[in-house]
């Protein structure tokens, strides 16, 4: 039995509820319910046959048209098995997730980053505040409905000797860009050219 199949069997045997697996040759993926994230990650770390004891990342993907707007993603590695596992769970933008900082201390900053950039909240987090944007920043910049220009401009005012927030002032009107290239005679395709129709 290969390593991925063995890992899948250990997880299936240990959890009564049905877990939806997906995998390729390089890693095993689990689609899990948000209420099971904490217990599954704890199991993956503590089980002597798995030892997924290194948290690599926590991130999210925004799907604004879905009811469950975000997929929250946890990536773990077992150095013992030389194996990667990815947990994915769909969550609503108003859902509160259990913090896994008691299992993996490195989750602290990852969860803060998800909160700051996507607005996903984690309960029982020791210090859930913004980590990448300013404390007075409006909105969450990795949400797909966040305006490209932002809501405010931030600058340091030399006269007032403090940071000043002002409405965004654009030197030209906002433009939407299409990545298909209007240029003729280019040998190599530019990024986005694959969607432009080729002329005969």
Language-model region placement:
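Terminal low-complexity/charged segments
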Residues: 1-200
């Amino acid at each position: 039995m290969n390593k991925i199949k063995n890992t899948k069997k250990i997880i299936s045997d240990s959890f009564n509820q049905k877990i939806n697996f997906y995998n390729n040759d390089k890693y095993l993926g689990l689609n899990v319910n948000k209420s099971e994230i904490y217990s599954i990650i704890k199991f993956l770390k503590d089980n002597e046959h798995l030892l997924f004891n290194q948290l690599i990342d926590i991130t999210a993907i925004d799907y604004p048209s879905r009811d469950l707007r975000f997929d929250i993603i946890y990536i773990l590695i077992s150095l013992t098995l030389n194996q990667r596992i990815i947990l994915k769970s769909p969550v609503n933008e108003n859902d509160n997730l259990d913090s896994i900082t008691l299992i993996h201390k490195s989750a602290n900053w990852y969860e803060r980053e998800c909160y700051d950039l996507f607005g996903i909240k984690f309960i029982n987090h020791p210090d859930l505040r913004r980590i990448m944007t300013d404390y007075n920043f409006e909105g969450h910049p990795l949400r797909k409905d966040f305006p490209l220009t932002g809501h405010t401009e931030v600058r340091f005012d030399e006269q007032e000797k403090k940071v000043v927030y002002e409405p965004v002032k654009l030197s030209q009107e906002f433009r939407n860009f299409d990545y298909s290239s209007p240029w003729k005679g280019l040998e190599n395709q530019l990024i986005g050219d694959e969607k432009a129709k080729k002329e005969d």
